[in-house]
């Protein structure tokens, strides 16, 4: 039971990291590799307590290094990351629980070519200058989840995530960026004795980003890209500023039924719909003007069918899902659409869990396709492609003895990337190894991960190495 | 309960979705311009369209290629599927016209700044003859060399005589203007008698360099790396009331400050100002400068949103949009003496100053 508890909370940690970082993504990606419980199916805080019954405290220190031997134009040559992560879960009484998380992360983007963004490609209106330099980012992130049973089997929960991050470039324009992000989710859930759970949640998120680029000499000219092919040269001035305001709302629903058709079959269905608006202002500190805005709107649906689950039997899981959204952007000066992007993403996967004595072997495969219709009207650029991807993986969990566990993962994948990767496909391969030992004072673990991305018919690769130490009690 | 909850959530989404902006009606890249170039001179009964005239569209918003095409026999040129943005439209052509002295070649210039409001745009630009030939403010070097200690004291200005006759600088004034023609910031005057003096001639097709200080900044301060050598300038500005104006070069004649109480050298805004060359018939700067006495006027500003300060009769636009302080760049007419009384069109930013010659 305790192991299940830890695993489920670690899943919470992973998902929270993905979805509630300094950029709030509107829709999450599902993978058959992960195990989803009632909470993290749509991040509904109403179900936190149903998945976790024992108090828990985890501490993690992690560091990573990524060498971009192959890179997009506005990517850094190397990324160094480090972070501290503290998580606690406590049952306050029989009906309520509280989970908190504090994360402090630093990252250093070395030899970053021109971009003043942490990820140039995540926005349609990205800021650049004309210098190459190192940019350091650092900041804390806080999360609080409160969960309570208000009536018999009727639950409610509130989750608040708040993060701040500051970035600084070491050469002119010495751009300083500050990003503030808030994410609030309120959820309701009902869980019957017969194993049927129904939930709904509403999410509001808001981000403010501020960039300040100063000028010393001539080279540091600031531009705002409109898409990826044309830019607006910002007026040369002593200080150029960019401000980003983004807010959005999403409603999600979920249904879970144990004993669906046959006793060992469970079905989980999740879906959501949301919209996000981004407004970008740029200019001098005294007269910033709207440089553009863009809106994303759409929804997703995901279904998981799980058979088995008891440790003594072979388990089987099937997943299928659809994500569909539409973006449109407009420059600030003129009431026209300058960028439009429609995405329809279909994914499906299968995994089987085979217990062999003290070993749990998981083998899985998933695939998907992203139907992209990206159009830049200002320069008439069209990227209309169906991008396929596939992944094969195996996870091995070994209980060496009563107090020690080992974990191995190996995966291979292939995906067709967007045009700005300038290659037809990328193959990835990765390996992860971890060991965890139980002591009288708690559990200490260490895990090591390597992942390599190799573009097709191109020189160079992206090599990622990471190591993490954890302490749980 | 479930029904009410779902209704509540959907209502909430609809409420918030309504707060977002509506999708615009038009896509970018479908702007069509149909431009006719016409020249009308009622005094001589001339009303013609300019055929085979090269029309240039320069995008003033985005970093984009310049579009060029030639007018047809109706004087019309069509540009299709352009991005929605501000364009500087220019055209020039030499026509054989009878302007009272027989048929002679006349250089006609047409220009306008176009702002899009609808998808299809049909309009006419009226060409005009060039501004009268004579002394022109040909180059303005104000931004300073590349440096990190805010050095800009190597400013200079260049005049050019575009006429076929000798011009005379005697008694002429050179002014830095305030926010209008009625507001004079600095006024400096050449020696000699205005209008009638003949001591300081400027030959046709020749340049005159006026330095803030006739000093070799390039070698003496910047070790020959950047900046300019102004020690051989034709004139230098001198203010007897400026105790800091120590670089008075004895080999270079002076243009003297005539503003009482003014204690600064002739230094102008690095990235924006208005300059006037006057014939010297009006030196009473208290009520501004008489527009009839203005020989040439140039307004420049690095800002694309700059609001005009000088009268449009003298200068319809402003040059130097995008020019960067401390870049070592300069602002010069497209061609020596090229003057349509629209500095937006007349001037281009050049990467380095050209002292006494055209780029």
Over which residues does each language-model region extend?
Chain A
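Outer-membrane beta-barrel "beta-signal"
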Residues: 461-473
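Membrane-embedded beta-strand positions of outer-membrane beta-barrel proteins
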Residues: 57-61, 100-102, 158-160, 186, ...
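Outer-membrane beta-barrel channels and translocator barrels
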Residues: 91-95, 149-153, 191-195, 258-262, ...
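Long, internal scaffold/assembly segments composed of regular secondary structure
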Residues: 230-353
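Short, flexible helix-coil linker/hinge segments at the edges of structured domains or between repeats
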Residues: 114-126, 203-245, 277-292
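Transmembrane beta-strands of outer-membrane beta-barrel pores
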Residues: 61-67, 104-108, 148, 162-166, ...
């Amino acid at each position: 039971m305790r192991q299940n508890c830890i695993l489920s909370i670690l899943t919470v940690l992973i998902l929270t990291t993905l979805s509630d970082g300094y950029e709030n993504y509107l829709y999450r990606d599902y993978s058959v590799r992960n195990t989803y419980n009632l909470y993290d199916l749509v991040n509904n805080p109403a179900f936190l307590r149903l998945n976790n019954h024992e108090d828990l405290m985890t501490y993690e220190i992690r560091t990573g290094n990524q060498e971009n031997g192959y890179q997009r134009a506005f990517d850094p040559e190397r990324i160094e990351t480090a972070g501290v992560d503290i998580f606690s879960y406590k049952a306050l009484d029989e009906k309520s629980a509280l989970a908190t998380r504090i994360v402090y992360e630093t990252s250093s983007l070395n030899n970053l070519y021109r971009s003043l963004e942490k990820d140039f490609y995540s926005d349609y209106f990205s800021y650049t200058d004309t210098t190459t330099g190192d940019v350091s980012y650092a900041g804390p992130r806080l999360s609080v989840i409160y969960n309570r049973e208000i009536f018999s089997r009727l639950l409610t929960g509130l989750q608040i995530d708040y993060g701040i991050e500051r970035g600084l470039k070491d050469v002119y324009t010495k751009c300083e960026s500050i990003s503030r992000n808030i994410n609030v989710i309120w959820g309701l859930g009902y869980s019957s004795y017969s194993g049927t759970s129904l939930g709904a949640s509403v999410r509001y998120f808001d981000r403010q980003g501020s960039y300040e680029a100063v000028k010393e000499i001539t080279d540091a000219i600031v531009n705002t890209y409109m898409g990826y092919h044309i830019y607006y040269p910002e007026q040369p001035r002593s200080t150029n500023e960019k401000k980003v305001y983004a807010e959005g709302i999403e409603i999600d629903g979920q249904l879970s039924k144990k004993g669906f058709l046959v006793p060992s079959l469970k079905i989980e269905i999740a879906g959501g719909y949301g919209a996000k608006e981004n407004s970008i202002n740029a200019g001098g500190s005294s007269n910033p003007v709207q440089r553009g805005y863009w809106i994303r709107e759409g929804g997703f649906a995901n279904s998981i069918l799980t058979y088995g689950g008891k440790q003594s039997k072979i388990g089987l899981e099937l997943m299928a899902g659809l994500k569909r959204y539409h973006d449109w952007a407009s420059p600030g000066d003129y009431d026209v659409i300058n960028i439009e992007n429609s995405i329809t993403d279909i994914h499906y996967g299968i995994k089987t869990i085979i217990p062999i004595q003290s070993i749990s072997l998981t083998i899985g495969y998933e695939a998907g396709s992203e139907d992209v219709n990206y159009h830049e009207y200002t320069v008439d650029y069209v990227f209309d492609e169906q991008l396929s991807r596939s992944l094969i993986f195996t996870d091995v969990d070994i209980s060496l003895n009563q107090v020690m566990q080992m974990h191995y993962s190996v995966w291979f994948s292939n995906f067709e990337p967007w045009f700005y990767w300038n290659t037809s496909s990328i193959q990835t391969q990765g390996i992860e190894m971890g060991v965890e030992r139980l002591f009288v004072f708690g559990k200490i673990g260490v895990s090591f991960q390597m992942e390599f991305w190799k573009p097709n018919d191109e020189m160079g690769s992206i090599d990622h190495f990471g190591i993490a130490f954890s302490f749980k009690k | 309960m479930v029904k009410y909850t779902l209704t509540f959530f959907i209502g909430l989404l609809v409420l918030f979705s309504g707060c977002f902006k509506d999708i615009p009606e038009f896509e970018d890249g479908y702007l069509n311009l149909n431009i006719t170039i016409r020249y009308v001179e009622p005094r001589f009964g001339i009303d013609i369209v300019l055929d085979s005239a090269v029309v240039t569209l320069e995008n003033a918003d985005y970093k984009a290629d310049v579009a060029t095409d030639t007018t047809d026999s109706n004087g019309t040129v069509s540009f299709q599927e352009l991005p929605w943005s501000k364009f500087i439209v220019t055209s020039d052509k030499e026509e054989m016209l009878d302007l009272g002295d027989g048929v002679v070649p006349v250089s006609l210039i047409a220009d306008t700044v176009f702002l899009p409001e609808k998808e299809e745009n049909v309009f006419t630009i009226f060409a005009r003859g060039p501004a009268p030939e004579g002394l022109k403010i040909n180059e303005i070097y104000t931004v300073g060399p590349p440096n990190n200690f805010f050095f800009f004291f190597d400013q200079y200005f260049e005049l050019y005589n575009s006429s076929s006759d000798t011009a005379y600088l005697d008694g002429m004034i050179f002014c830095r203007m305030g926010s209008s023609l009625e507001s004079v910031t600095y006024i400096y005057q050449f020696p000699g008698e205005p209008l009638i003096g003949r001591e300081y001639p400027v030959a046709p097709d020749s340049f005159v360099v006026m330095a803030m200080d006739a000093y070799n900044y390039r070698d003496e301060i910047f070790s020959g790396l950047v900046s300019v050598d102004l020690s051989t300038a034709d004139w230098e500005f001198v203010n007897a009331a400026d105790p800091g104006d120590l670089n008075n070069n004895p080999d270079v004649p002076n243009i003297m400050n005539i503003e009482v109480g003014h204690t600064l050298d002739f230094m102008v805004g690095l990235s924006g100002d208005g300059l006037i060359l006057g014939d010297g018939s009006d030196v009473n700067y208290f009520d501004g400068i008489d527009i009839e006495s203005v020989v040439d006027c140039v307004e420049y500003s690095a800002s694309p949103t700059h609001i005009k300060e000088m009268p449009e009769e003298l200068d319809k636009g402003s040059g130097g949009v995008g020019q960067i302080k401390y870049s070592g760049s300069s602002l010069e007419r497209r061609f020596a003496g090229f003057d349509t009384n629209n500095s937006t069109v007349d001037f281009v930013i050049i990467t380095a100053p050209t002292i006494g010659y055209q780029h």
